[in-house]
Amino acid sequence: MSKGHSLQDPYLNVLRKERIPVSIYLVNGIKLQGQVESFDQFVVLLKNTVSQMVYKHAISTVVPSRPVRVPLLNADGTSAEDENGG
């Protein structure tokens, strides 16, 4: 996993696992709403009444409907929260 994905992947994974409704704003201003069904390096699969494949390069902002706690990882893959008592 590249360094650029050290926050993005865990964040999207929490949204997916907890089925948190999100609003995704695209760079052209369009707002999409739904739940993150899946994602990879290039796309996010957003599910509402239908599934939409949204290319990450077109995404400006992801806004969850409630606060999200993301488990941060150290370079070796261990949880930073474990060491800090979090």
Curated annotation (Swiss-Prot):
Gene3D superfamilies tied to this protein: 2.30.30.100
Domain of life, source organism: Bacteria
UniProt GO BP: regulation of DNA-templated transcription; regulation of RNA stability; regulation of translation, ncRNA-mediated
One GO CC term, this protein: cytosol
SUPFAM superfamilies: Sm-like ribonucleoproteins
Keyword RNA-binding: yes
UniProt-recorded Gene Ontology molecular function terms: RNA binding
Disulfide bonds: none
One Pfam family per UniProt: Hfq
Keywords: RNA-binding, Stress response
Coiled coil: none
Sm domain mapped to chain residues: 9-68
Job description of the protein: RNA chaperone that binds small regulatory RNA (sRNAs) and mRNAs to facilitate mRNA translational regulation in response to envelope stress, environmental stress and changes in metabolite concentrations. Also binds with high specificity to tRNAs.
Family: Belongs to the Hfq family.
NCBIfam families linked: Hfq, PRK00395.1
Quaternary context: Homohexamer.
Protein name: RNA-binding protein Hfq
